[in-house]
Amino acid sequence: MAWGLFQILMISFFHLIKLSSQQETSFVYETFRSQENLYLDGSATVLPNGLLQLTNASDHQMAHVFYKDSIELSSSKPLSFSTHFVCALVPQPGVEGGHGMAFVVSPSMDFSHAESTRYLGIFNVSKNGSPSSNVLAVELDTIWNPDFEDIDHNHVGIDVNSPLSVGTASASYYSDIKGKNESINLLSGHPIQVWVDYEDNMLNVSMAPREVQKPSRPLLSQHINLSDIYPNRRLFVGFSAATGTAISYQYVLSWSFSTSRGSLQRFDISRLPEVPHPRAEHKNLSPLFIDLLGFLAIMGLCTLTGMYFFKRGKYAEITEEWENEFGAHRFSYKSLYKATKGFHKDGFLGKGGFGEVYRGKLLLSREKAVKRMSHDGDQGLKQFVAEVVSMRCLKHRNLVPLLGYCRRKHEFLLVSDYMTNGSLDEHLFDDQKPVLSWPQRLVIIKGIASALCYLHTGADQVVLHRDIKASNIMLDAEFNGRLGDFGMASFHDHGGISDSTCAVGTIGYMAPEILYMGASTRTDVYAFGVFMVEVTCGRRPVEPQLQLEKQILIEWVPESRPTMEQVILYLNQNLPLPDFSPYTVGISNHSSVLIDAASLVASRSWSAASSATNSP
């Protein structure tokens, strides 16, 4: 019996030794002269000085480098790992820089299905965000892509099965000497150290310049359970990079990795291989050509100087302190000028009370709408700031999403998503547009009601729009209503009182009490009621060409005006309509029943919606 027990103990002991050896992986590459246990594909290659080059001067390419031995996940022991590598991203001369690179953890070394450019050779369109991707990546991204909600063009992100990062931060490091974060330019061409540590389901990412030790504080910390990402428990680690039309050279100088806690091998930073910096090629020229070039240079100096000052004035921008407070994304005027082809008439979408709107296409993004606002002294600046504030604070599916802004001399520019179907008033009053069906009108009204309810009760502050009308409502590809144009908006704290005493708005939509009581949520509700009648009747609030008694669609409104929460309940038929008489005692003793009339018109219209498939 004793001998049998001894055999069992010995077998268990050797099994544990074997299991431990399977789970622990550790290696270091001070240079990559020896490619032992490395898998390279795509444009990846090792230069004579031992530098691992991922991408070169070719466009639309991918590169992958993986350590060939896999890491086995144990069901009994949580995975932990640490890696330290030094990389350098070098743009071509005269080019802002291409796409970045990433440290990758994957169950496979086969990325033939991946795409280049913004997908970094890791992801693709068809499986973007799919759990079956089974990929964890720490990206060093040098292209701003709003489709992936990138914060800027110089950031670090943690990606799980998608290029839409679960955690992101601008490239920087914590300086223990200065006690604050110092920024890092990923495209500086200088070596950058990166540390990735995973333990107890927490992923920490740190970075620092070549000469700085590992910071005491990580740049990014994200809770991630790798067991949820990798069901087959067999992993490979390595790097991926890609180029598009824009190109950068991406290099890895040294790399150390370990799954054993505290056993990450160090390499000598002072002995790193030199990073090459591409220069423009020059051919041998004869003295005659040299003299000719000198003459042309002198002749062109004045022209170039003039062009410089002309372009400097053309694209000059203004920056003020309030912009840093709101932290919204700022576009360069040059990028917007090029996106709209110089605000060409072919991209002109329309003109409103505060400026013209143009269609434009920014680099690597969908079409955008660029509003070029009119300048009118302090009032114009207030309208511009109001929209910038709304861009930072307000997020709702029925609001036009503002993406950024620009200010240049006396011009204010706002960038938003391009709404495919234009503004609502075009579909109501333009004979060239298809007539909206009753179901479409109902969806639009309910969407704007939801947006207005959010502005009044759901945002951090009470937001008074103060200019609700059909021309300020845009329609997306599915004909959902999106409320926009916050140039007249005002903000105040919940429970507070608005200081908006000026009577602003559009005639026909303005509540009568606004002249002596100022704006409030009730005046927004009045404008919404007029808008609702306008949509259901297909008639403008004011028609000057009609007989005097028929010019104004709605003249007065009852004092018992509902809140936006009640309006939504009415629209969803979750609350019975109030029983108003045709006229009630109210302002000037002539208060007609707007919400009753609007609801009556809407109810009769909507009751036919189930059978109405054609235009109303």
Curated annotation (Swiss-Prot):
Origin: domain of life: Eukaryota
Catalytic activities: L-seryl-[protein] + ATP = O-phospho-L-seryl-[protein] + ADP + H(+); L-threonyl-[protein] + ATP = O-phospho-L-threonyl-[protein] + ADP + H(+)
PROSITE patterns: LECTIN_LEGUME_BETA (PS00307), PROTEIN_KINASE_DOM (PS50011), PROTEIN_KINASE_ST (PS00108)
Extracellular side: 23-288
Active site residues per record: D467 (proton acceptor)
Gene3D superfamilies, per database record: 2.60.120.200, Phosphorylase Kinase, domain 1 (3.30.200.20), Transferase(Phosphotransferase) domain 1 (1.10.510.10)
Region (Legume-lectin like): 24-258
Entry binding sites for ATP: L349, G350, K351, G352, G353, F354, G355, E356, V357, K371
Signal peptide location: 1-22
SUPFAM superfamilies (alphabetical): Concanavalin A-like lectins/glucanases, Protein kinase-like (PK-like)
Bilayer disposition of the protein: Single-pass type I membrane protein
Annotated TM spans: 289-309
PANTHER family: PTHR27007
Protein name: Putative L-type lectin-domain containing receptor kinase I.10
Encoding gene per record: LECRK110
